[in-house]
């Protein structure tokens, strides 16, 4: 498996917290700085409702083809966790190792971003989740996307706790943060000051964190 100079995993505390929006913002921000990027979605499951899939959105943001972002055989048109969608559609089960092995990066990519599915402990393959994949790909940084409002402290603590054993620094991004919302402000301060998480509230801050992190990871 080839590897970019810097490799990031974007994951979430739950489904629909805005992982794809954040990842697209990162890709746009990096490209605006002249950084060659590539995005990968190891597997995607989705409703057939006519809306663009995550892979299509990430492809548009990174200047790639959707099936370069997510291989065609990993598109599952059923709105459930990817391994469950595969089973529901009568398709072959797959492992975390197979997802990791299918990650193929263009030689020009200075930054590669992997967006996972669902929450940190949501099934990503028949034998694992985002934590499993992080152990396999050894990212240089993990970006945990969370809601800014009620319930986020518990969700971040549980998700970040599961990710910390992977060795990569975890940056918490509070999505949809409103500086005028007292609860959002208190949640950010609690996570940063009491729990000592690295918390950001804008995509611009995320771009800087990603570019500042040491690259290299584990190379083949």
Regions found by a protein language model. Name each.
Residues 1-8, 207-220:
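Short, low-complexity, intrinsically disordered N-terminal peptides in bacterial proteins
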Residues 5, 35-36, 106-110, 139:
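Short, high-confidence coil segments that cap the C-terminus of an alpha-helix
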Residues 5, 21-91:
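N-terminal phosphate/diphosphate-binding loop that engages ATP/GTP or pyrophosphate donors
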Residues 6-10, 110-114, 142, 170:
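Generic beta-sheet signal
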Residues 9-24:
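Glycine-rich phosphate-binding P-loop
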Residues 26, 116-196:
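Conserved catalytic-core segment of NTP-binding enzymes
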Residues 80, 192-211:
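Beta-strand-loop-alpha "switch" segments that mediate conformational coupling across diverse proteins
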Residues 81-124, 131:
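Phosphate-binding/switch loop-helix module in NTP-utilizing enzymes
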């Amino acid at each position: 498996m080839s590897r970019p100079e810097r490799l990031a995993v974007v994951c979430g505390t739950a489904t629909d917290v805005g992982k794809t929006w954040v990842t697209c913002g990162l890709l746009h921000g990096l490209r605006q700085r002249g950084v060659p990027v590539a995005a990968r979605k190891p597997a995607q499951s989705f409703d057939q409702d006519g809306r663009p899939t995550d892979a299509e959105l990430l492809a548009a943001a990174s200047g790639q083809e959707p099936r370069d972002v997510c291989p065609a055989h990993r598109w599952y048109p059923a709105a459930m966790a990817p391994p469950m969608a595969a089973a529901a559609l009568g398709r072959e089960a797959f492992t975390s190792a197979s997802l990791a092995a299918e990650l193929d990066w263009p030689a020009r990519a200075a930054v590669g971003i992997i967006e996972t599915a669902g929450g940190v402990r949501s099934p990503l393959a028949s034998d694992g989740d985002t934590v499993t994949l992080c152990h396999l790909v050894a990212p240089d940084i993990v970006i945990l996307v969370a809601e800014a409002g009620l319930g986020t402290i518990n969700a971040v603590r549980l998700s970040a706790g599961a990710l910390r054993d992977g060795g990569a620094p975890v940056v918490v991004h509070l999505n949809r943060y409103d500086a005028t919302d007292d609860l959002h402000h208190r949640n950010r301060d609690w996570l940063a000051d009491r729990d000592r998480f690295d918390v950001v509230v804008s995509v611009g801050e995320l771009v800087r964190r990603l570019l500042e992190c040491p690259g290299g990871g584990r190379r083949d």
